[in-house]
């Protein structure tokens, strides 16, 4: 026979299962429609992006062909033409081959082999055999005008050609873009026609990059599939009788099909298949949170209900049988109440347990008193006392004894304890009458001012009022205070603010008082936020580089550029580089940040220099902290990044930033020496503000020095003498000076008088990404 509790429990289980099944069914019906609609929207969005990317790819090929054409201007010698084409092909891995029809109708073919070696085939006579460099005949009676890339194209326009069989790669299709030389170009070029062939492997890899792992993407020309992404290469793709493609795999994935012509290139079609229709795979995981939440709520309600019933039936049964459980229920006041109908024996047991409970409370209060107050000083040890009393206070302060650990290490625990007792005695003498004093630990005390707030403020602001009591020079007192009313229940939050303020001066070597206002707290909090978030900011791309040109101060010709790091936070807006660079050095993050800046600067410089008209001696200046130069293998990593980007050492300048650090080690000078041997220039940034003393100046022997903007901006004031001294020093050592922060013509003229030849500043151009620079090599004026 089932008990009443068991019967109710069974009914609850049935009700819970019915509710859960109903909810699950309704959820999946609604969710399936939402998932399908969302999959279509995502497919449209993804396809739009892929259309643009594929269009950009073909546009890049066309631009590359034009770039190739530009490289052949004024070249008449066939050897020069060959070298120019090979050089360009080495920089364009997406091209498989390049063909030239010269103005004498002879044909040259530059073909990329499997090992990336570029092989040249040519004709000795018009329409004659096509031979390799050794004279071996590759194709007899080769007539360029009959090749598909020539036949299919209009002589007046540049155009893409349908896929055709490559003569030098049996079984492989070629796709060519043909460039016709017309008009004035015909007089400047020794070429009548150029065709470039796509690198199939590169195109396939590009489709892999722009598509997700679960998307099928391929390109079609006519009835030929000319390129596939990784998933398309793995799937079985069947062209059906309806003119569509079926994607066959082992799991019967449902795909949303999207097709269109390549933008501005109707010759090729894009086929895109986005996975959709699978509820478990396609649905956003966050969509299932409400479902999981309702199930959990139902389960919790069931467990709580059964627990309540179980407890009620248990108590009823136990009260009927025995009151033996009461000694184990000393904290359950409800169980000890005398109720009508209680037997005399039950009342006696409840009274006995109540007496035991009262005795326990008395012992607990005595114990709480012992653990809440320091028995020797009388100071409060437990903040719960302050919070529970919730008294009104007029101000709050904190006292920190620094250097106590050193005393203990040298003189022992007894001497340490002696100093702590003396400190507590002095604190009690000065503040006990007007403050509640809380001991956090032996060297940290919180003062909560009850009255006489002016006296309290005056006393706590006194510096060195404790120093003579200890007799140890390295012991120092750091104090801070907030002068505003507060309740005891909020005392802990004020204590945390004061601890934060004290932490900002923990390394100061003298006793100090810091008034803790909102501005100070905001500054400390911002520095902590920067330290915690700078790594994440670098990872998500909030840190980026801008470049300010360095110009000839007389002609204003651009001589180089300085890479400058900027941080625009989505949460806090623009973060000053003076702050986050300094903090990165303080927390040991400067090496990781510095290498990221070097990689980014060299990569962006490489891309910009390929498409811009820069002087041959253009110099990219990259700021490097002395902390980085203290690293053993800095020059090796710098060189590796330089070679990866194909840059020449004489196009780079390392600017050593003016950071004051405790020790310059032997690696600092070794790195400078190795970089200089390779041809990298060395400059001292912000000369005169930090690192640069005369000894280091001569040890580094820089190729140039930069005068900080704080000096140039005040050149007509007190800083003018410093600027003149710097220029005299540089002139004596025959070292060029670059003036930073030039913002007016008056300053520029004064610098010219001093012999300055290079400058940078907003007078010429503000810092901006290379993408915003004038590619002709001129300054950008807003």
From Swiss-Prot:
Organism: Escherichia coli (strain K12)
Catalytic activity: 3',3'-c-di-GMP + H2O = 5'-phosphoguanylyl(3'->5')guanosine + H(+)
Annotated keywords: c-di-GMP, Cell membrane, Hydrolase, Membrane, Transmembrane, Transmembrane helix
GO cellular component term, pick one: plasma membrane
Pfam families referenced in this protein's UniProt entry, alphabetically: CHASE9, EAL
Span of domain EAL: 527-781
Mode of membrane association: Multi-pass membrane protein
EC number: 3.1.4.52
Subcellular location as annotated: Cell membrane
Coiled-coil intervals: none
TM spans (from-to): 12-32, 286-306
The protein, known as: Probable cyclic di-GMP phosphodiesterase PdeI
Primary localisation category: membrane
Summary of the knockout phenotype: Cells lacking this gene have a weak reduction in swarm size.
GO molecular function: cyclic-guanylate-specific phosphodiesterase activity
